[in-house]
Regions:
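Conserved beta-strand hairpin/beta-sheet module of binuclear metal-dependent hydrolase folds
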Residues: 1-58, 138-151
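Short, solvent-exposed loop/turn segments at secondary-structure boundaries
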Residues: 102-106, 159-163, 197-198, 239-242
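Histidine-centered divalent metal-coordination motifs
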Residues: 69-75, 133, 188, 251
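C-terminal regulatory/interaction regions
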Residues: 216-326
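Short hydrophobic/aromatic-enriched beta-strand-loop microsegments
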Residues: 87-94, 149-151, 238-240
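Active-site HxH/HxHxD metal-binding segment of metal-dependent hydrolases
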Residues: 21, 42-123, 283, 289-290
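Aromatic/hydrophobic pocket-lining residues that form the small-molecule binding cavity
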Residues: 76, 168, 248
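Metallo-beta-lactamase
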Residues: 34-37, 42-44, 124-216
């Protein structure tokens, strides 16, 4: 999908309720010249198939540089694969390096606020530090074409999770002030063709949510973030409750830092024993292996069904009936 003169999008369908509609992989650069990819999806086969298939069918070239908007695995999961199979140089957010331990090649470049990636053909990609969703969140901007790559700082079909609300609000206002902003390419969801309106909507939404939280607290008595979340999101998909609670806690932290709410410290549970942690890790490993094996068997079954329709019924007939005109 062509976004601008230098930008193409590979939109991969995603069933995760946290990732509405699509997960976006973006290719930047003049076709036939050096290319940069921003985010490359989770370490799952279908992301790799989509990207390799697109490169083979449309780009007919390989990736020179692969980078990411932040460390979360649905954006960084294929960095080792991009290095090994696409032979790409890898660039990551500088302060995301410790968060990517074990998931990146041994040799990587790092990016920080103010850096510029210069590609062949005069394409200049600005690097913008936009913490808030995560501590290492970056956005990338091609000012000449007005194209912003927002990662999970803004999504195409919903609001995002926020780890540091004060930083996030500053990041939104910074993006709102970008010159020549025309289109936004989010980490998940549809391409945004009204980016300034969407940014302002995000700012307004966070202000609205803060006021709703204050309204609940004005009811009197100490209350947990979870109970506040249940009041604010009564009909939310249950699979998204913890994400919603995380955002409520981000609001409460900012309110506490500003001296507007009092915090009664909770009582944490005792840490799990090393043996229990190891059992849980092994359970997850065995479960994931079983799921992977099940998917393989499902693929084999599907292929067998296709073959059964493509070929004559040799399982029924050693010598099938034959027919001749009388």
């Amino acid at each position: 999908m062509k976004i601008s003169e230098s930008v193409r999008a590979v939109l991969v369908a995603d069933e995760n309720p946290m990732h509405p509609d699509f997960t976006g992989i973006y290719l930047i650069g003049k076709q036939g010249r050096q290319s940069l990819t921003i985010d490359s999806g989770e370490a799952l086969d279908h992301y790799q198939w989509f990207l390799r298939g697109y490169l083979a069918a449309v780009e007919r070239e390989e990736i020179a540089i692969a980078t990411i908007t932040h460390h979360h695995s649905d954006h960084s999961g294929n960095l080792k694969w991009a290095k090994e199979f696409l032979k790409a140089d890898i660039s990551i957010p500088a302060n995301g390096r410790p968060l990517l331990k074990g998931r990146i090649p041994s040799k990587v470049d790092t990016l920080k606020d103010g850096d510029v990636i210069d590609l062949d053909g005069g394409v200049r990609v600005q690097v913008l530090a936009t913490p808030g969703h995560s501590v290492d969140s970056l956005c990338f901007y091609i000012e000449e074409e007005g194209v912003l790559f927002s990662g999970d700082t803004l999504l195409g079909s919903s609001t995002t999770t926020v780890s540091d609300l004060a930083a996030y609000r500053k990041s939104l206002k910074r993006l709102l002030d970008l010159p020549n902003l025309k289109v936004m390419c989010p980490g998940h969801g549809k391409i945004i063709n009204d980016p300034r309106e969407r940014l302002q909507m995000y700012i307004n939404h966070r202000d609205m949510r803060e006021q709703q939280i204050l309204n609940v607290l004005e009811g009197g008595g100490a209350i947990s973030s979870w109970d506040i979340m249940l009041q604010l999101y009564p009909d939310i998909d249950k699979r998204l409750r913890r994400a919603a609670d995380s955002n409520v806690r981000s609001h409460l932290k900012q309110l506490a830092d500003e001296g507007r709410v009092k915090v009664y410290e909770g009582t944490p549970r005792k840490p799990k024993s090393a043996a229990r942690v190891q059992r849980e890790v092994e359970h997850v490993r065995q479960r994931d292996l079983a799921i992977k094996h099940g998917r393989k068997l499902e693929a084999e079954r599907s292929r067998a069904e296709v073959r059964a329709q493509e070929n004559p019924p040799t399982s029924d007939w050693k010598e099938p009936p034959r027919f001749e005109l009388l």
